[in-house]
Amino acid sequence: MVIVTDSNFLDAAGTLRKGLLYCDFVAIDFEFLGLDVSAISLHDTVESRYQILRDNVIKYRPCQLGLTLFKQKSNRAYKADTYSVPLFQRFGDNDTSISLPSMRFLVKNKFNLNQVFMDGVEFCTRKEFKKFERALLAGTAASYLSREVKSQIELLKVMVHEKCYQSTSYHITHRTDEPMQKIPLKMKPNSSVSLRMPRNLSSVEKYMIIYELTKAFPQFLFTCDEKQQNLHVKNISDDYLKEKDNLERARARCSESVKGVSAILQVVHMTGKLVVGHNSLLDAMYMYHYFFSHLPANYQMFKDKFNALFPRIMDTKLLAQALRFELPGVGDSLENLGDYFGSDKSDKTVPPELRGFIEPWMNPLEDESENVYHNAGFDSYVTGEVFLKLAHIYINRRNNFKNEILDFDRIYQYLEAPILNRLPFQLMDVGCCYLTGDDSKGFRPDVITIVRRDRVAIEEDEFRYLEKALGTLMATYQFDIEWSKNKKELFLATNSPGSYAFLCEKFSNDSSLAPLDELDSGKKWTFEQRQTAWRSFKNRGVGIGINAKRIRAQNQATKIQRAMEI
C-alpha cells in the first residue's frame, strides 16, 4: 500500500494518473468523520432515505479515500496498486461535525487521525476550484491564506532583496512592492541563494508563497528542497525560462495543490473506468458531493447526475447476495468476504490465478502496517479482490463453465445486465438503487397495520407503552413502529418473515389490538401460515400512505386465504 499525504501528493499524482489510464477497473472506499443512523427507519421511502443520507454527507466530511487500481496481465492473472489517502480540506467551507462514537471506532481500528489533520490531502468541488482560479487570475488568491502566512510572504520578499541585491536603506525600509517595480534584481549566472521557509506549511500554502514571490520577482525561479525547509532562488535564464512561462508554471502548481485529490477522481471520470465499491451508495454520494458538486435536492436528480459522471459502477454486496446459496455462511459484509477469500477455504471456488494475495502492479509494497479493515486503502483492495473472485464464481457457475480465469472484458459483459449501476439500499423495501432506471422491488415483508378492535383512536400513552414494550420484546430483531396521522393505526415494519409472523401472532392474540387484515376478513391465521405467506402487496409508488392501507390489508387477507386452501 502506498500512503499518499499532502507532503508527497504532487509527486505521487503522476503515477496515480498513469495507473488510472491503463488499469481495467478501480475499487474505491471512503472513511467519514461520522455516520448518524438514528434517523433511519424501515418505513423510509427512497426519497426520505436519500434525504437522511444526504444530511449525513453534508454534516460529516470524508477523512480518508482508498483507491486500488487493478490490471489484468497477459497471463490473465491480476496485479493491483493500492493508495491510502488521508483527506483534509483547509480552504473550503469550515462548517463540519465530528461524531465521537465514529472517531472511537476508527481509532480502535488503528486509524491515524493525526495524519488526517496534519498531513491530509486537499480536495474541492468544481465550483470551489473555479472560484479559486478566478481569485488567482484576479490577483486576490492571497485572501485564502492566514494573516501569519501573508506576513511570512512579505518577510520573504524583503529577504530576497537582501540576498539578491545590495539595496540602499531607502529600498529596505519602504514597502517591498515599490523597489520590485523599479529596481531590476539580478544574480550572477549559475548561482543561487537559499531562504528559510516557515515550518508546518500545507502544500497549498507552500505553493501560494512561491506563486506570490514569482509574481513579485518573475526573473527568479523559486524551488523547495526535498525536505521543504529551504527555498532556493536562481535566475530563470539558467533554465532557459521566460518570465511568462515561469509565472504560469508557478500558477499551475498552485492550482494543482488546491485541487488535490479531486483531480485524481476527475481522471476516473474522464477515462470512464469501471468503479467498484462495497455497499457503496454512501461512498457514491460522498464522492459526488465533495469532489464534483453539491448533492442535488432530490433522489432522482442524484441518480441522473451521478450516472452522468460515472456511467459504470458495480457493487460487490449485490454479487455476494446473489451467491448466498453458493457460499452459505459467508454473508455479504466486506470483512466476512475478505476473510473467506483470504483463506484456503476459498481455493476450490476460484481459479488458481486468483488464489491468495494479488501482487503489486507498478508500485512496490511500501507499507503493510495499515492493512487493516476500516482503513480505506485496505478496504478498497479487499473490495476489488472480492469483486474478481465473486464475479468468477457467479459467471462460471451460472454458465456451467469450468473453474477458469476469464478475460476482464468477458466479466464485464456477463455482469452488465444483472449488476451494473445498481447500488444496495440497507433496511429498505427496495431491491437496490438503479442509477439508469427504476429501482427494483424489495423482498421485505409487508408493513403490518395494527388497530384497536373497537376501531377507536390509540392514545399516546398506549402508543409509547407499545413502542417501549416491543423494543424490549424484539431485542436484536430489526423493526420500526409508526403512528398514523388519524391516531387509529400503528404501522409495524420488519425485515424478516419470522419477525413478521411473530408480531402478527402477538397482536392476533391481543385482547384490545389486532392486525387490520384479520379484522377486515374475519379470519385468523397461524404463525406458520403467516411465515409462508408474508408477502401480499407491493407497490413502490404507494409506499405506506394512508390510502393504501385498506388495499394492503385486503390483498394480504386474500393471499393468506389462498395459501390456506392449497
From Swiss-Prot:
A molecular function (GO) term: metal ion binding
Keywords: Cytoplasm, Exonuclease, Hydrolase, Magnesium, Metal-binding, Nuclease, RNA-mediated gene silencing
Domain of life from the UniProt record: Eukaryota
Stretches of the chain forming a coiled coil according to its record: none
Marked site: Interaction with poly(A): 317
Enzyme Commission code(s) on record: 3.1.13.-
Gene3D superfamilies to which the protein is assigned, alphabetical: Ribonuclease H-like superfamily/Ribonuclease H
Binding, a divalent metal cation: 29, 31, 283, 379
Tissue expression per record: Expressed in germline cells.
CC cofactor: a divalent metal cation
Localization per Swiss-Prot or TrEMBL: Cytoplasm
Record annotation: effect of changing residue 29 to A: Greatly reduced nuclease activity in vitro
Phenotype reported upon loss of the gene: Slight changes of mRNA bulk poly(A) tail lengths. Animals display a reduced brood size at elevated temperature of 25 degrees Celsius compared to wild-type. Accumulation of untrimmed piRNAs with 3' extensions, which are stable and able to co-localize with the piwi protein prg-1. However, while the expression levels of piRNAs remain unchanged, the piwi-dependent mRNA silencing is reduced, as is the production of piwi-dependent secondary small interfering RNAs (siRNAs), also called 22G-RNAs, on mRNA targets. 5'-end processing and methylation of 3'-ends are unaffected.
UniProt keyword annotation of Cytoplasm present: yes
UniProt GO cellular component terms: cytoplasm; endoplasmic reticulum; nucleus; P granule
PANTHER family in UniProt: POLY A -SPECIFIC RIBONUCLEASE/TARGET OF EGR1, MEMBER 1, POLY(A)-SPECIFIC RIBONUCLEASE PNLDC1
Function summary: Involved in transcriptome surveillance. Required for piwi-interacting RNAs (piRNAs) 3'-end trimming, which is important for both fertility and piRNA-directed gene silencing. Has 3' to 5' exonuclease activity in vitro.
Protein name: 3'-5' exoribonuclease parn-1
Source species taxonomy: Eukaryota, Metazoa, Ecdysozoa, Nematoda, Chromadorea
Gene: parn-1
